[in-house]
Regions:
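Non-catalytic, low-structured ubiquitin/UBL-interacting segments
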Residues: 1
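Functional transmembrane helices that embed catalytic/metal-coordinating motifs
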Residues: 15-17
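Cys/His/Pro-rich metal-binding microdomains
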Residues: 20
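Structural alpha/beta surface segment adjacent to cysteine/selenocysteine redox centers
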Residues: 23-128
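C-terminal cap of thioredoxin/glutaredoxin-like
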Residues: 4-13, 24-36, 107-111, 115, ...
């Protein structure tokens, strides 16, 4: 069935590239394309703006080794359901530059945005790269055919480097939107008036889509 024959489905998603459940949620949401002309408004919100630009060791999260290993085991089980093989998570990174880059890429259309979108998730969670590192991001952007001038424009905001309590202008509307709908976690999926948060199953997403499209 072509997109012209499918019912249109507009969904907003509040998301961050350093959230593993956002990666899993992205994969699950994409499964709706089989039945809908899916239009997603990705709303990028930093979940850890206080993380230093180049990140820090996960030990600073103050989990015990047993607790951390249990969390990772459960996470890998969820990821494997979507054919994702996670690399060992040893560092937490700052996502601000990655989010700004993805936001800027939207102006070049879905054919540029989605390869970068996927690359950012894969780089961090599958390949274990630091997507807070500018050189890593430049390489990912180049591989997705983003021109240098767009990269520079994406990072031209005075708050690109921080401080943590100042949100760049390009991302501020999303933070305000999240506050307006009282979203307290990522991912949050907005199907018109129906809001789903956290680890949402494919069945729940399908039901929300049916509710929205009648």
């Amino acid at each position: 069935m072509s997109d012209l024959q499918k019912p249109e489905l507009k969904v907003s998603v509040i998301s961050d590239y350093i959230c593993p459940f956002c990666f899993i949620g992205h994969k699950r949401l994409e499964s709706l394309r089989d039945h809908y002309d899916l239009k997603i408004n990705w709303c990028f919100v930093e979940i850890h703006p206080d993380t230093p630009p180049l990140g820090h060791d996960v030990a600073l999260l103050n989990y015990s080794e047993d607790t951390w290993n249990s969390l990772m085991q459960n996470l890998q089980q969820l990821a494997s359901e979507e054919n994702i093989t996670l690399s060992p998570q040893t560092r937490v990174t700052n996502s601000r530059k990655a989010l700004l880059l993805a936001e800027a890429s939207k102006q070049l259309g879905a054919d540029v945005f989605y390869p970068l979108h996927e690359s950012l998730f894969n780089a961090y969670f599958v390949e274990g790269q630091n997507i807070g590192d500018e050189q890593v991001l430049r390489k990912l952007a180049a591989d997705c055919n983003l021109p240098d001038e767009l990269i520079e424009a994406a990072w031209s905001d005075p708050y690109t480097q921080g401080p943590e309590d100042k949100t760049p202008q390009a991302l501020l509307p999303y933070l305000q939107y999240a506050g307006a709908i009282q979203a307290t976690s990522v991912p949050t999926f907005i199907f018109n008036k129906e809001i789903l948060s956290g680890v949402v199953s494919k069945d729940e997403l399908r039901q929300a889509a049916r509710n929205m499209t009648g």
